[in-house]
UniProtKB/Swiss-Prot annotation:
One of its GO terms (molecular function) is 3-deoxy-manno-octulosonate cytidylyltransferase activity. Pathway: Nucleotide-sugar biosynthesis; CMP-3-deoxy-D-manno-octulosonate biosynthesis; CMP-3-deoxy-D-manno-octulosonate from 3-deoxy-D-manno-octulosonate and CTP: step 1/1; Bacterial outer membrane biogenesis; lipopolysaccharide biosynthesis. The keyword Transferase applies. InterPro entries: Cytidylyl_trans, KdsB, Nucleotide-diphossugar_trans. Pfam families: CTP_transf_3. It is found in: Cytoplasm. It is an enzyme of class 2 (transferase). One of its GO terms (cellular component) is cytosol. This is 3-deoxy-manno-octulosonate cytidylyltransferase. Activates KDO (a required 8-carbon sugar) for incorporation into bacterial lipopolysaccharide in Gram-negative bacteria.
């Protein structure tokens, strides 16, 4: 009988933010944003436990106040992956899920969808999600990361540029082509799942040329020859980068 794998969701949370300082503690209907993320992650069927990883005592205190588990991390980490690797090194888990701390509307089913490839195939070190692009604005926006993959779901590339480039239709791109599915393209959903043993490998890799060009850390994995499995999801969330994004979250929760 195969041993049941222990799967831990880790939520990296910082207080400092250039566009929205203290957003992890932003009030959403009486609870801090980090609590919303924590509670939704805990509802994922495949997740055994949830941990908030932070270097800020204000966030740690808020997590403890609602009964959550918190791990304090070094304040010198340059990336969320480094913070994740520090926590992974001292907890008992087989699979680590990196749940973004600014996704208060994340659906627990999305987390389960991203985990399953690692349960089905022991050779996969890392997995993530994608969803269909349905507007021309998203397709053209450098703030929306596009992704292409092979027929078996292995990522080929992530980019801030339009991807793929529809050469024959470029001068006649319209929203309805994306809505109808005539033009199929996907945006990356920033939820990552790792085998625990892969995290220190990833964190130990040097930044790569394409990673630095696109400012996309996950390209470091591809440039070093590792596979990333990607799964399409029907669910969409709202990342909170600004106070205006927070207003959108509140509107959806109230509506």
């Amino acid at each position: 009988m195969r041993r049941q794998m222990k799967i831990t969701a880790v939520i990296p949370a910082r207080y400092a933010s250039t566009r929205f300082e203290g957003k992890a503690l932003a009030d959403i209907m009486g609870r801090p944003m980090v609590q919303h993320v924590y509670e939704r992650a805990a509802k994922a069927t495949l997740v055994s436990e949830v941990i908030v990883a932070t270097d800020d005592e204000r966030i740690a205190a808020a997590v403890r106040a609602f009964g959550g588990r918190v791990e304090m991390t070094s304040p010198t980490h340059e990336t969320g992956t480094d913070r994740l690797a520090e926590v992974a090194a001292r907890i008992d888990a087989d699979i680590i899920v990196n749940v973004q701390g600014d996704e208060p509307l994340i659906d627990p089913a999305m987390i389960d969808e991203a985990i399953r490839p690692l349960l089905d195939d022991p050779s996969i070190p890392m997995a993530t999600l994608k969803c269909r692009i349905k507007t021309l604005h998203d397709f053209l926006s450098p703030n929306v990361v596009k992704v292409v993959s092979d027929p078996t779901g292995n990522v080929l590339y992530f980019s801030r540029s339009p991807l793929p480039f529809f050469r024959d239709k470029w001068n006649d791109l319209k929203d309805d082509a994306f809505v109808s599915g005539k033009l199929l393209c996907y945006k990356h959903v920033g939820l990552y799942v790792y085998r625990r043993e892969f995290l220190p490998v990833f964190a130990g890799l040097q930044p790569t040329y394409l990673e630095l060009a696109e400012k996309l850390e996950q390209l470091r994995v591809l440039e070093n020859g590792y596979r990333i499995k990607i799964v399409e999801t029907e669910f969409e969330s709202i990342g909170v980068d600004t106070p205006a994004d927070l207003d959108k979250v509140l509107e959806r929760l109230k509506g």
